[in-house]
């Protein structure tokens, strides 16, 4: 679906390192983690060979972040046009041309692709080769028919969509987040298996583009890892878009009949569909790496085991990105890859910070979060929850988008340990909270920073101010402020 289709061939560099018997760093995998690690190490002056079996750019460019957000942009535009009458703007006959939508998606990929191309890597000083790399020992790997030696190696092969062994599912030719971009036409009836971020995003997108969508999630609710109130708002939005949500349901079998394909549910229900999208999680791509020969271990789920410095059981081999089992986001892969590259080629001892990795679900409304959620703030937790509903945020009122909130989770000293923001462009309001959580800032620090008005950032600001005001009414603080007022009155009465 792009200018560089899967399976394309591109020129490879020599596998022999210049002026040495071994490469300073061998990078296996050319997605976000591999690209960032390779460029970082080359920037430090190391000799770097990156080996990619298919296309550089990885899932984010070709089948993940870029195409999905382009598709969502088109879908949200259709929804906004249909809803324009609420603002006094009538848009008659909103029609979706799915072929043109997919052309727009391809254009987005084509625009971003040069940044992640082999040419861009070479310009950064990285040697690039196309092929399958397999570890053959603690410091050697086979690339095609050649043996390559390395002083350090970094594994960055990512993860792939998992397809559950549901009887009959394979017969229905299921789509995944990797393959859905090859759809020849808009599905009339789409079944989405999985109610996580990917399922919710793509389910809403196809519903807004005109498909009849049914989402089936085994957990009791969608977005089970997020704040329950946030999940409820997204669920309500999906239902308003015409999506049928079946939470707490499991598909036991797929059969075919006169009406099309049919998903049989454990509760006795059925869902008839034409196409099925599987979005139930991802599995690491490690089967072809030869990990056992290099002394690299994996956990019970198959993810490469790393320490806090992203070092594997082989101290000369590092790993970054989705195959480590850390939160599977492009930004995580990039930050961790840079860290691992510095540790590998410079001997640094930097450690990862998993607690403050931001996450965003790009539905309408968006859900942006970091750290712990309100569900962790039980009576014995010592945590405090401060929430501003967007009915109190003037920008949300002006835009008619008050179905949302900004929520801070604070420890006993008022330090930010988590946050959830729901609303338009919620992810854009999150960075200041991530910074606060990472550096131990307190609600009073956020309250003291002037926020532009009117913005959705007002939600976080008001939540932090709310906490400060609560603190001012604590008995100890109240005694201090009363004493200061008394002193001030006496001074003014002189």
Mark where each language-model region is.
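FAD-site-proximal beta/loop scaffold in flavoenzymes
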Residues: 170-186, 270-346, 432-436, 447
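A conserved FAD-binding loop/helix module that cradles the flavin
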Residues: 226-233, 320-376, 453-476
């Amino acid at each position: 679906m792009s200018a560089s289709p899967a399976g394309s061939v591109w020129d490879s560099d020599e596998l022999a390192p210049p002026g040495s018997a071994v490469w300073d760093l061998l990078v296996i995998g050319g997605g976000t983690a591999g690209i960032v690690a390779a460029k970082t190490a080359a920037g430090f002056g190391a000799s770097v060979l990156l080996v990619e079996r298919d296309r550089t750019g990885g899932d984010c460019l070709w089948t993940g972040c870029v195409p999905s957000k382009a598709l969502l942009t088109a879908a949200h535009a259709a929804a906004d046009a249909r809803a324009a009458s609420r603002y006094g703007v009538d848009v008659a006959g909103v029609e979706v041309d799915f072929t043109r939508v997919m052309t727009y998606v391809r254009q987005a990929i084509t625009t971003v692709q040069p940044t992640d191309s082999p040419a861009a890597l070479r310009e950064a000083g990285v040697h690039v080769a196309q092929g399958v790399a397999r570890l053959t020992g603690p410091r050697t790997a086979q690339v095609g028919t050649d043996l390559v030696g390395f002083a350090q190696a970094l594994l960055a092969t990512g993860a792939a969509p998992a397809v559950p062994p549901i009887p009959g599912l394979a017969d229905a030719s299921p789509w995944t987040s990797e393959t859905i971009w090859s759809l020849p036409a808009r599905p009339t009836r789409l079944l989405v298996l999985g109610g996580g971020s990917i399922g919710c995003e793509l389910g809403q997108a196809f519903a807004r583009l005109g498909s009849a969508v049914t989402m089936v999630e085994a957990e009791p609710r969608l977005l089970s890892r997020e704040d329950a109130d946030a999940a409820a708002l997204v669920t309500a939005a999906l239902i308003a878009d015409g999506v049928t949500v079946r939470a707490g349901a499991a598909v036991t079998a797929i059969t075919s009949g006169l009406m099309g394909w049919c998903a049989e549910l454990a509760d006795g229900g059925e869902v008839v569909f034409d196409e099925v999208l599987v979005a139930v999680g991802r599995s690491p791509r490690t089967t072809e790496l030869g990990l056992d020969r290099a002394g690299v271990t994996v956990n019970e789920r198959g993810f490469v085991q790393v320490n806090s410095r992203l070092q594997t059981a082989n101290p000369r081999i590092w790993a970054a990105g989705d195959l480590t089992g850390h939160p599977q986001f492009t930004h995580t892969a990039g930050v961790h890859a840079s860290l691992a590259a510095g540790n590998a080629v410079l001997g640094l001892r930097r450690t990862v910070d998993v607690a403050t990795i931001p996450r965003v679900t790009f539905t309408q409304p968006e859900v942006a979060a970091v750290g712990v959620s309100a569900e962790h703030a039980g009576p014995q937790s010592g945590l405090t929850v401060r929430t501003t509903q967007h009915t109190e945020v003037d920008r949300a009122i002006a835009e008619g988008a008050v179905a949302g909130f900004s929520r801070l989770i604070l420890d006993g000293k008022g330090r930010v340990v988590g946050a959830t923001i729901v609303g338009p462009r919620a992810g854009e309001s999150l960075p200041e909270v991530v910074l606060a959580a990472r550096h131990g800032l307190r609600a009073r620090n956020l309250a003291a920073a002037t926020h532009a008005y009117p913005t959705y950032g007002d939600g976080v600001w008001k939540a932090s101010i709310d906490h400060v005001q609560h603190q001012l009414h604590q008995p100890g603080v109240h005694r201090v402020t009363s004493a200061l007022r008394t002193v001030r009155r006496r001074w003014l009465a002189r």
